[in-house]
């Protein structure tokens, strides 16, 4: 892979997305599903979420180490996927590791004598001289620094831990944490931020890339990469040029291992971070697309969606798009922010959020340093429920996704038209909003799903998108009025055309290949 080839190296095939245990309890269950005749030629990629590795929180995103979780996956499973011709996408959680990682456990055991003393970020050392000491011993950064901090939870992002000498230390902890005292002994759970100024961290990154490549990875999603670079005086989210410097360094390592990097970042459209990523030859995770599809179907208008499609073409943006995913439906991404126009007006976004909540969704917000809400972030719901649990709407949304330029990623629960699992979200407690869209399916659920027209129709369209050479050709938007959507692909004599009526939610797909014309009608 050349330095200029990251976007060009992104595979143009349909990608399944699931946890290793989403189907019948383990990765072998997904392999069995993909070996069924209904799935022949359907998927060329599989994004396996990080609970395939050893982890302890956040369903995989709190990594202990990158060895395979033997309860859920095996080398034989990976070999079987390779035999099916399915390339793999894995996560590398750049910003943090679990408290349970060997590195943090060594720090807790040996304290200042640990070889990993600088592997994580000592909060007080980082902010030394830049704030005041709180009564409990941690530094409270001065207001000009606090105003720049981007928070994922209320309060300061710190975890207080006790060293062997009895001293309490404070470590940067952007995401989850929990401290318990049982019989006088402290226990910790948390996702601890890594110190990207430490050479040991970069050795760890290199070793991890090499391991993922050995597993058969083609794409590596860089989870939470925008939080990695931290410097006094800068925001802790996508500060520049430090973030770009880190990303370029990671790119060099990835290219040595034949890997395509997919940086994961949620940011307002108006910040134009997606443009910068694309201009630097990185694929873009299209977090704009889900909300734009909902808007197009709810409003029966192509206006906002076509504006984004036009930008993809004009700026040569290589995307990975999705409807649903393991996370929520992004909404902050659609905003313009203080620097520019959004893909949707704020009032339209607020109205969409209200509709999704009326349809059973849950809201995730972002917070300031004082614990107050500063922005909505995402709505947690299955995409089927977000569309009002209408088969016709989900079928139309899938067709639009498969015809829009980009690598289409398909959440397993959307494929099976899964509804909001409100009971699971309630059982999971205050932070359980994401469980609404993570229902595991048994082999019997898969069997029953494959008897439903909405599932079979999606698979029919997915097979066409994955296998037809038309989608390796030239794309165009056919001019129509704003209630229709015509998207056309042509590669030589092979043509695929989507003709959708957004008002009636009916559409046809016409496919011409080797002198034969096939028309798929859905109404």
From Swiss-Prot:
Keyword Transferase recorded: yes
Reactions catalysed: sucrose 6(F)-phosphate + phosphate = beta-D-fructose 6-phosphate + alpha-D-glucose 1-phosphate
Temperature-related behavior of activity: Optimum temperature is 35 degrees Celsius.
MF terms in GO: glycosyltransferase activity
Keywords of this entry: Carbohydrate metabolism, Glycosyltransferase, Transferase
Site, as annotated: Transition state stabilizer: 327
Catalytic center residues: 223, 264
Annotated positions binding sucrose 6(F)-phosphate: 58, 96, 221-223, 264, 326-327, 434
EC number: 2.4.1.329
Top-level EC class as recorded in UniProt: transferase
Superkingdom, taxonomy of origin: Bacteria
Subunit structure: Monomer.
Described purpose of this protein according to its UniProt entry: Catalyzes the reversible phosphorolysis of sucrose 6(F)-phosphate into alpha-D-glucose 1-phosphate (Glc1P) and D-fructose 6-phosphate. May be involved in a new pathway for the degradation of sucrose, which could become phosphorylated on its fructose moiety during uptake via a PTS system. Shows strict specificity since it does not catalyze reactions with alternative substrates.
Similarity comment: family membership: Belongs to the glycosyl hydrolase 13 family. Sucrose phosphorylase subfamily.
Protein name (database record): Sucrose 6(F)-phosphate phosphorylase
């Amino acid at each position: 892979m050349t330095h200029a080839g990251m976007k060009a190296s992104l595979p143009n095939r349909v990608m399944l997305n699931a946890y290793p245990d989403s189907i019948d309890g383990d990765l072998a269950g997904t392999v069995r599903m993909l070996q069924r005749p209904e799935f022949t030629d359907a998927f060329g990629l599989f994004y396996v979420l990080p609970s395939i590795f050893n982890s302890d929180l956040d369903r995989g995103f709190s990594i202990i180490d990158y060895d395979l979780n033997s309860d859920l996956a095996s080398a034989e499973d990976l070999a079987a996927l390779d035999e099916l011709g399915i390339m793999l996408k894995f996560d590398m959680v750049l910003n943090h590791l679990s408290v349970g990682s060997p590195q943090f456990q060594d720090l807790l055991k040996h304290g200042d004598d640990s070889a990993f003393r600088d592997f994580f970020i000592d909060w007080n050392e980082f902010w030394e001289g830049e704030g005041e000491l709180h009564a409990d011993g941690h530094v409270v950064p001065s207001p000009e620094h606090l105003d720049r901090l981007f928070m994922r939870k209320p309060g300061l992002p710190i975890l207080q831990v006790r060293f062997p000498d009895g001293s309490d230390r404070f470590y940067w902890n952007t995401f989850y944490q929990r401290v318990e005292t049982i019989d006088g002994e402290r226990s910790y759970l948390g996702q601890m931020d890594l110190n990207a100024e430490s050479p040991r961290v970069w050795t760890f990154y290199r070793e991890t890339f090499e391991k993922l490549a050995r597993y058969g990875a083609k794409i590596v999603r860089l989870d939470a990469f925008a939080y990695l670079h931290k410097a006094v005086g800068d925001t802790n989210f996508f500060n520049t040029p430090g973030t770009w410097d880190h990303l370029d360094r990671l790119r060099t390592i990835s290219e040595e291992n034949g890997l395509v990097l997919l940086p994961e970042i949620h940011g307002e459209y108006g910040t134009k971070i997606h443009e910068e990523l694309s201009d630097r030859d990185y694929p873009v995770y299209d977090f704009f697309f889900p909300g734009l599809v909902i808007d197009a179907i709810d409003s029966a208008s192509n206006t906002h969606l076509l504006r984004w499609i036009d930008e993809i073409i004009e700026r040569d943006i290589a995307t990975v798009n999705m409807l649903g995913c393991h996370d929520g439906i992004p909404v902050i991404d659609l905003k313009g922010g203080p620097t520019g126009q959004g893909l949707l007006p704020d009032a339209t976004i607020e109205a969409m959020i209200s509709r999704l909540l009326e349809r059973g969704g849950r809201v995730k917000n972002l917070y300031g340093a004082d614990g107050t809400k500063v922005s909505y972030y995402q709505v947690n719901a299955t995409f089927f429920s977000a569309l009002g649990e209408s088969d016709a709407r989900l079928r139309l949304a899938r067709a639009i996704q498969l015809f829009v330029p980009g690598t289409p990623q398909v959440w397993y629960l959307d494929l099976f038209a899964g509804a909001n699992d409100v009971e699971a979200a309630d059982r999971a407690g205050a932070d359980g909003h994401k469980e609404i869209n993570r229902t595991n399916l048994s082999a019997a659920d898969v069997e029953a799903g494959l008897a439903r027209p909405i599932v079979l129709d999606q698979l029919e369209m997915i097979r066409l998108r994955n296998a037809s050479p038309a989608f390796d050709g030239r794309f165009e938007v056919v001019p129509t009025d704003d209630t229709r959507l015509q998207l056309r692909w042509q590669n030589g004599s092979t043509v695929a055309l989507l003709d959708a009526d957004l008002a009636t939610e009916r559409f046809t797909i016409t496919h011409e290949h080797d002198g034969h014309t096939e028309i798929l009608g859905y109404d």
